[in-house]
Amino acid sequence: MSNDCTCPVTGRVDKPIASSGRANRDWWPHQLNLKILHQNPPLGNPMGEEFSYAEEFKKLDLEALKKDLYALMTDSQEWWPADYGHYGGLFIRMAWHSAGTYRTGDGRGGGGSGSQRFAPLNSWPDNVNLDKARRLLWPIKQKYGRKISWADLMILAGNCALESMGFKTFGFGGGREDIWEPEEDIYWGSEAEWLATSDKPKSRYSGDRDLENPLAAVQMGLIYVNPEGPDGNPDPVASGRDVRETFGRMAMNDEETVALVAGGHTFGKCHGAGPATHVGPEPEAAPIEEQGLGWKSSFRSGKGGDTIGSGIEGAWKPNPTTWDMGYLKVLFKYEWELVKSPAGANQWLAKDVDEEDMVVDAHDPSKKHRPMMTTADLSLRFDPIYEPIARDYQQNPEKFADAFARAWFKLTHRDMGPRSRYLGAEVPAEELIWQDPVPTVDHQLIDGQDIAALKDTILASGLSVSQLVSTAWASASTFRGSDKRGGANGGRIRLAPQKDWEVNQPAQLKTVLQTLERIQKEYNDAQSGGKRVSLADLIVLGGCAGIEQAAKNAGQAVSVPFTPGRTDATQEQTDVASFAVLEPAADGFRNYLKTRYTVSAEELLVDRAQLLTLTAPEMTVLLGGMRVLNANYGQSRHGVFTKRPETLTNDFFLNLLDMGTVWKATSEAGDLFEGRDHTSGELKWTATRVDLIFGSNSQLRALAEVYGSGDSQEKFLHDFVAVWEKVMNLDRFDLA
């Protein structure tokens, strides 16, 4: 007899799908995660491979869109009523929390991909009820369709919210493209519970409250700080330390931090009308009938004046829908008493409040409340560095408005890369130092004949293949696909801080740069017209020449593509502190590890490959080529599996896969190895974990076998040259 409940595929009744069983990572939790190299593939993008968001954005009537957003601000909906009849505070928070996940340590996070729509961000405790903000935006997104991404719309809505309440913003640049699945490459922390305090297992803190890198939030599920204070302790001075650390890791200095907090908290209110026990599960855990909405509340109406969010309740100042100096006035005018909100959260209320400073209730005009401050807010008054900055802003309203406008623009655009990527009519004309500016091309570029002649000159200069390749790699490989920073354009490898980074071998780098600068000067001086070559271009061209020579050494003729057009930035255009975060702590492609880390060297390699936007095959062929080109840090022999270095062959893979070699760890940490002849015991090679992972990991070994096959030399050369060109041009947004 048939069973109608039996699965027609497996014949089983219960749990017939793959996601119901144990995954490979459940069996082998330390398995190397290569999936982060293949996120958001074209097959998962409904827009199709021919879709160009930049072209669609050009068709957008930005003025009409903004008018619709302005109208939305005061179009209060019964299903989620607007506080004070204005959604401005909600949309500012949505935009802030979209952009505010950015951290300088690895450039990840931020609002550049619309990731707030997906887990985990859509369900973070700090993003409570922002699902409602996005649903309020849906009719507008639906109207304009592909011409505006969710990523751009969320930021623009924040701008329009500010403008609709009387604030003049600094500008807006579009160009953020949506992703279509959660980002898996971002490390948000190791804690196993939301909002875990620093005393819990797997804490992100060590020592004297030292926050783990690259994290930029104090607890799992928060954007920055706990508004109640460190671990909920209502200490404004201690909170100031947390604020400084987290905002600093988001690229904000003290002045920008004060401006952002004071400016942002000029608007809206916090929500803690009742106990959090009334709040239902977050969107990712909510039942299917909720259709992606979460945090359904059973407290009275569950909305409007009964809303429960952060647990803190109230507004910071009177007129929460108007730009004015009220926040700073109230902050310094009153003394503050610590109280518990109706939800039980620590917060502060002003004492002996004048009638003019009382806050009208957000939903019942017959009620008034005392202004409130969070512990984090009070750090602006009691932190010895923040306090004078805040008082200066209070006494200089125009300075404060300008500082907030600039800080807001930086907050919402920091992860977009150079100004050339911004789209739209509201892009500010002013060039800002944090945008890593490079000069525009103001000269005639070198042509094919010049390129060939310069290659010959470089190869005759006495510089080795290793030196040329290493220098070009050092220049280009600073690029981060996360925030579109770094890369060879600008030639900043010759400037502080990059010229002094240990990984760049400053002594060797100086020699190479002096030689290339001489070649550059001789060439430019010989030109009668306006033709010039930049050092940035010459550095990359030197790497191309080195690779062609290495292929020639192997008896192969290859032409490495080169496109001129890079320019040389000045030291004045380079923020040393800002660029310092680009220094590699590890670069597996150069077999460099600054120190030993709790994370394995092979995981750090994959992480860097992901930042370089490489696929697993690209990472594999690139590393194999770099090894035989002898491009290791310090000319180390680890992983140089060839008897003919500086010859572009697939020897790395041939010798890695040789079953006649027996490997044994030679360091207590298990990060250095010797490979000896299986029969004689003679030492053949030395290696690091980064080298041997290509023979150990089953996926990487499968790729290594492709390049280690007898007929693979031509494919190896082709694929290596292709990925080399890709890395050299990662920051060439002008070529897109």
UniProtKB/Swiss-Prot annotation:
tRNA processing recorded as keyword: no
Site (Transition state stabilizer): 93
Gene Ontology molecular function terms on file: catalase activity; heme binding; metal ion binding
Residues noted as binding heme b in the record, renumbered to the chain: 265
Membrane-spanning segments: none
Root EC class: oxidoreductase
Record text on cofactor binding: Binds 1 heme b (iron(II)-protoporphyrin IX) group per dimer.
Family indicated by similarity: Belongs to the peroxidase family. Peroxidase/catalase subfamily.
Protein name per Swiss-Prot or TrEMBL: Catalase-peroxidase
Taxonomic source organism: Pelobacter propionicus (strain DSM 2379 / NBRC 103807 / OttBd1)
